[in-house]
């Protein structure tokens, strides 16, 4: 049975106003996923994690943490990556850079709350590959399009990635790109009962989330 060794590093940055932001992924409506029959399906390693990093906008403040990969698969056909899905357990989100247990617990509860990822109602998030286009003569990277689902909201995102499929493994590396978290409802004032103060707090956190993905699949 073939095994997949997956290492995913998703650096999420709520970048400060003075920081140079990464290129923004093209975001649109969710796209239809077409099944690719006849290929090889490989299960993701259960020990994989997602790393995150967040910033405030107007002050120098950041935090780091991880989210566990719950399950998923990759699909390979004729030597190419043609599909796949990664499901993340949002209830597992933790902060790793705060030593004080009380402060760390407060942040983790806040991230799991309705203000952000609302894990009681939406315990998982997922990225499902729709299409992988080979690089052209003018482009170094492949172009990857997939459906990203957070808080039950699905949007398509398109970004460049270095995809290498060999007899030994599959390597997937996406240079840092950003998305707007508010398009997935991750904002204080998404609640009907949100106060003006809560809405102002959301403006202290940059709406751009920067993502960096590295995946290695060993056959």
Q: Which residue ranges define each predicted feature?
A:
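Low-complexity, acidic/polar, glycine-enriched regions of mature
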Residues: 17-219
